[in-house]
Amino acid sequence: MRDLQAPALPPDQGERLTRDAYKRDFRECEATIRDAASWKLERRQHFEEQGSPSRDALRRGQWEEALRLLEDRRDALRAAEEEDTQRGHTFHRVRVVETPLTPYMQWELHSHRQRAEYGERIRVTDAVQTASAETAGPLPEIVVLGGSVLFQVLYDDAGCCIGASRHTDHGTVSNWASYLEKLFTAGEDIASYFTREVAPLPPPRLRRD
């Protein structure tokens, strides 16, 4: 993928949203999608997610509890997939991975593998493959919903979400949707990647608070 350069993302075209406004707008936009695809690019190797009991357990250094709590959401994942199927909505996720895996990434790949069991399309690409597109800095965190709106999700240095930049310019949204589709096609399915690279790993060494 050396010749796969990322499209432009003009900052002056985006509308800056607070975290709460982004979450609200995301939910409203997603609910209207019919017979369309969405795309997400994840590049950072560490996030401080909120509202996830499993993530909280990881933060406390409780690895087995973190994995157990992932099991508790299977009914919710199944229901979400059934709703997406009824609406004709397919969600694709591209996960850029650096090695060795951070403790967060090891946990997230367990989470993603489970999501894939319920229909989410997830593929992994090594950071080496995207290096040529990152000469000016890491790729942004991007979500394209239904081909109509793009969110560049913004984070602070600790990995906490602080909001997003909302883009609706047709050319910008279309170019990024096409780019993420190419990254997705070039990546490896989460199932085979997980079996080879993640399943054999011992629990990550975590600091207990």
Label every PLM stretch briefly.
Residues 1-209:
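PLD/PLD-like phosphodiesterase catalytic module centered on the HKD motif
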